[in-house]
């Protein structure tokens, strides 16, 4: 996930790693939920993808007309190689199951295994940012405002018209149009996000505490935000939960000074993302069978058990591959 995953190894911001850790854990938890309609998942879905794009935008790289191709190559390496790792792994596993069932390999849908949308959309957002920055000086406030107005307008138009496509690259373009305002927002508010003050005023903390119940209430009023389906519910409610969720996680991360677990997951977030689809899917199937054998039928227990086991496996697998096989994530 671009700079969301790849902050300079020589200079890291602990609270950004914490924010990334919170974000990726929410992704895993959301995938462990048995339905998009349950209250917990509606809350997670209401802001977690905008949060990813915003955090990535914080470390967006500006390029000139002369250096933009080098910037595109670097982003392709850091974002599309993990995408290939994920897709090839899915092809191998699903293809093996397909053949074991006696089916013809020629009928296997290889292209569907490349349909995971987040990393390609983030790649498109980064290209858009580099292109705009090479043409316009986004350091100037007036250009920031105009750029954000245009980006927001395009995003709203697409959502209002329910634009969708079954063609994968076109679908990525549609999603990137909705994601761009959050990505640019991360860049525009970079100084505010990276600044950590030792003075925490009481009323700031009180306002922060109020954000969570507001997000919970609004997310239950709105329909589930399903970005993978290009479904966002009511536009004002989508943007309210997105912005409040971003503020909540960013500001909360500044107050969680010593959280090594979150920092570790933040550093490993690209690896956790790549493997979470497989691990969560495997865990839920195994645990579901065990619960049926025991005569248990409780979604909350299944979700909690799936999440706990998946997090342990994901940490071990992500840690090992990140250190031993960094090329899987475009690191070398």
Which residues are covered by each model-predicted region?
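Alpha-helical transmembrane segments and their immediate juxtamembrane cytosolic regions
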Residues: 1-332
């Amino acid at each position: 996930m671009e700079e969301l995953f790849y902050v300079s190894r020589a200079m890291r911001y602990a609270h950004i790693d914490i924010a990334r850790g919170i974000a990726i854990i929410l992704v895993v938890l959301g995938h462990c939920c048995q339905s998009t309609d349950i209250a917990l998942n509606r809350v997670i879905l209401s802001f977690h993808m905008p949060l990813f794009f915003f955090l990535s935008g914080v470390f967006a790289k500006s390029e000139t007309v002369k250096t933009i191709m080098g910037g595109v190559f670097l982003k392709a390496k850091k974002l599309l190689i993990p995408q290939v790792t994920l897709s090839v792994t899915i092809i191998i596993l699903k293809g093996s199951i397909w053949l074991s069932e006696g089916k013809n390999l020629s009928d296997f849908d290889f292209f569907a295994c490349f349909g995971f949308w987040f990393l390609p959309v983030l790649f498109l957002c980064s290209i858009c940012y580099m292109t705009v920055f090479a043409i316009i000086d986004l350091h100037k406030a007036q250009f920031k405002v105009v750029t954000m107005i245009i980006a927001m307008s395009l995003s709203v138009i697409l959502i209002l018209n329910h634009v969708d496509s079954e063609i994968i690259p076109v679908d990525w373009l549609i999603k990137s149009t909705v994601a761009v305002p959050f990505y640019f927002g991360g860049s525009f508010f970079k100084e505010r996000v990276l600044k950590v003050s030792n003075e925490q005023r009481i009323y700031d903390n009180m306002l922060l505490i109020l954000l969570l119940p507001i997000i919970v209430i609004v997310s239950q009023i709105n329909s589930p935000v399903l970005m993978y389906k290009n479904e966002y519910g009511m536009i004002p409610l989508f943007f309210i939960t997105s912005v409040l969720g971003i503020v909540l996680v960013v500001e909360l991360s500044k107050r969680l000074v010593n959280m090594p677990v979150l920092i570790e997951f933040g550093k490993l977030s690209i690896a956790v993302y790549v493997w979470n689809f497989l691990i969560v899917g495997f865990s839920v199937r195994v645990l579901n069978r065990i619960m049926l054998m025991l005569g248990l039928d409780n979604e909350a227990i299944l979700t909690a058990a799936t999440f706990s086991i998946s997090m342990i496996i994901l940490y071990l697998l992500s840690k090992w591959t990140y250190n031993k096989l960094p090329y899987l994530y475009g690191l070398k």
